[in-house]
Regions:
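Oxyanion/phosphate-interacting regions
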Residues: 54-60, 74-140
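Acidic beta-strand-loop-alpha-helix segment within the catalytic core
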Residues: 1-75, 118, 127-140
Length: 140
């Protein structure tokens, strides 16, 4: 996943093999929180969070969140810069596949609101709700 305006490139090729390319060198995503351990940070696609999303923010005790566009949301969770990304159904399978691999290969998880695994090859290709958790959040 490449974010040209941020000049950030993330990739993965198997379990424990998620990286960010920094100065032309791969840096393994360490999954260590880069924020205060007392504050749970979430990333969102909107500043106007729907009640269903706010319910999960309350459940997980999210202290603050930041709006961010693109699949970069998955990458910043995998890198430990944010703890969570929670979204309602809106994207198709191809919108999340690369981010899904990067998060899971960094030790994080992606599940739906009912804690089911995210599966691919659905007839309409639409995703369900998503809860993306970084490894540091799962371990914490």
């Amino acid at each position: 996943i490449y974010a040209p305006d941020k000049k950030r490139l993330f990739y993965s090729y198997g379990p424990s093999n998620s990286f960010e390319l920094i100065d032309k060198r791969p840096k393994r995503l360490a999954n260590k929180r880069k924020n205060n351990v007392d504050t749970i940070k979430a990333v969102s696609y909107s500043n106007n969070l729907k009640p269903e999303i706010l319910k999960f923010h309350k459940k997980f005790k999210v202290g603050n969140y930041k709006k961010m566009k693109s699949s970069l949301k998955f990458c910043v969770v995998a890198a430990g810069e944010f703890d969570l990304y929670i979204t309602e159904p809106r994207a198709c399978e191809w919108d999340i596949a690369a981010g899904h691999a990067i998060v899971e290969h960094s030790g994080g998880s992606i599940r739906d609101f009912n804690d089911n695994e995210i599966l691919y090859g659905k007839p309409n290709f639409k995703n369900q709700s998503l809860i993306v958790k970084g490894k540091s959040f799962l371990d914490g």
